UniProtKB/Swiss-Prot annotation:
The gene is petB. It comes from Rickettsia bellii (strain RML369-C). The chain crosses the membrane at residues 47-67, 98-118, 131-151, 166-186, 194-214, 247-267, 306-326, 341-361, 368-388. Its main location: membrane. Heme b b566 binds at H111, H212. Component of the ubiquinol-cytochrome c reductase complex (complex III or cytochrome b-c1 complex), which is a respiratory chain that generates an electrochemical potential coupled to ATP synthesis. Binds 2 heme b groups non-covalently. One of its GO terms (cellular component) is plasma membrane. This is Cytochrome b. GO terms for biological process: respiratory electron transport chain. Belongs to the cytochrome b family. PANTHER family: CYTOCHROME B.
Length: 400
């Protein structure tokens, strides 16, 4: 019997070698399993893998939902309700996709916060950081278009408000808005193109994630101490050590995910989106999804439409400049006492902006939003360069 098994194994190996010589997919997988990683990574380094799992879930559920969705203003709302009532486990698919978007953004926001704290944007990882911010921007575009598809009141008026922002561009703004709408108002052509782009953009995100991984593997992961790996004893193979650690993170992630799907599926949404879109009735309070609220607060903080648009886009663009705005040679905030305080003040400011973005556009929220928006830019444009110049960091360790 053992004589029968041995040739079969050899034949299998020969086939694998033949394929791998022409298409090195098995060598690629082997590289991942033997990839050397800093030995002191904490659970915060699980967030990249968790975001990857969230992206896969969004693509799978999105493709299946698209099979039952009708991108037409007369049928979109009803098709979503049909998915909820008549499609087998349609309610589960829709809630998984809707909650999954929030979970995806939560993982990415924590991933970005970890990068800010440990200086993962510093040399030689500038391009790694830039690709990550491009992924974040693409996610925002995808999520916005997806929010329009149910064609409820918030969907319609959210699309109207956000697309109208482009009208603030001098000379060509109105033409751009008409081009985006495919007509003179948000209507069927708008819904069709948003559906098409919402289907396309996740696959562009996958391509960007591949680039992100290539950039990551070029210089390896940063670590909590923020120092470079100096010897092989500072590293361990990614598998099995960090794959096991990732599975622990996945377990926690899916417990939280399942809680929202089965117990609070609409907690992060807005009840007005269960009302069919009506161009003649404006909601009392137009609110975007929670993950857009800090930027929405910055947009509303400025009376001028053009000024608000510039600040809103500037609040994201400033992240591209971060590798050069932070002048400190030390990466990790663990060894930067002043920056560590500034970081947590900045985190509190972002949470405050998120809260203010969900409040009505009235006093005192507008005034507080202006102060919070000012501090947001102060942190990047003033505090970081000055802290890096004058801060005295703690002594760095010699090894991990």
């Amino acid at each position: 019997m053992s004589d029968n098994i041995t040739p079969k194994t050899g034949k299998t190996n020969a086939i694998i070698e033949w394929i791998d010589y022409r298409l090195p997919v098995f060598s690629f997988l082997k590289h991942f399993s033997h990839y050397q990683t800093p030995k002191n990574l904490s659970y915060l380094w699980n967030l990249g893998s968790i975001a990857g799992i969230a992206l896969v879930i969004q693509i799978i559920t999105g493709v299946i939902l698209a099979m039952h969705y009708t991108p037409h203003v007369d049928h979109a709302f009803d098709s979503v309700e049909k998915i909820m009532r008549n499609v087998n486990y349609g309610w589960l698919l829709r809630y998984t996709h809707a909650v999954g978007a929030s979970m995806f953004f939560a993982a990415v926001y924590l991933h970005i916060a970890r990068g800010l704290y440990y200086g993962s944007y510093k040399a030689p990882r500038e391009l790694l950081w830039h690709i990550g911010i491009i992924i974040f921007l693409t996610m925002m575009a995808t999520a916005f278009m997806g929010y329009v598809l149910p064609w409820g009141q918030m969907s319609y008026w959210g699309a109207t408000v956000i697309t109208n922002l482009f009208s603030a561009i001098p000379l060509i703004g109105k033409s751009i808005v008409t081009w985006l709408w495919g007509g003179f108002s948000v209507d069927n052509p708008t819904l069709n193109r948003f559906f098409s782009l919402h289907y396309l953009l996740p696959f562009i995100i996958v391509a960007l994630v591949m680039l992100h991984l290539v950039a990551l593997h070029q210089h390896g992961s940063n670590n909590p101490k923020g120092i470079d790996v100096k010897s092989p004893k500072d590293t361990i193979p990614f598998h099995p050590y960090y794959t096991v650690k990732d599975f622990v993170g996945f377990g926690v992630y899916f417990i939280i995910f399942a809680y929202f799907i089965f117990y609070e599926p609409n907690y992060l949404g807005h009840p007005d989106n269960y009302i069919p879109a009506n161009p003649l009735v404006t909601p009392a309070h137009i609110v975007p999804e929670w993950y857009f609220l800090p930027f929405y607060a910055i947009l509303r903080a400025v009376p001028s439409k053009l000024g608000g648009v510039l600040l809103m886009f500037g609040s994201i663009f400033v992240l591209f400049l971060l590798p050069w705005l932070d002048t400190s040679k030390v990466r990790s905030a663990n060894y930067r006492p002043i920056y560590r305080i500034a970081f947590w003040i900045f985190m509190a400011d972002c949470l405050l902006l998120g809260y203010l973005g969900g409040q009505p556009a009235e006093e005192p929220y507008i005034t507080i939003s202006r102060f919070a928006a000012c501090y947001y830019f102060f942190h990047f444009l003033v505090a970081l360069p000055l802290i890096g110049k004058y801060e005295k960091p703690l002594p760095l360790p010699e090894e991990l």
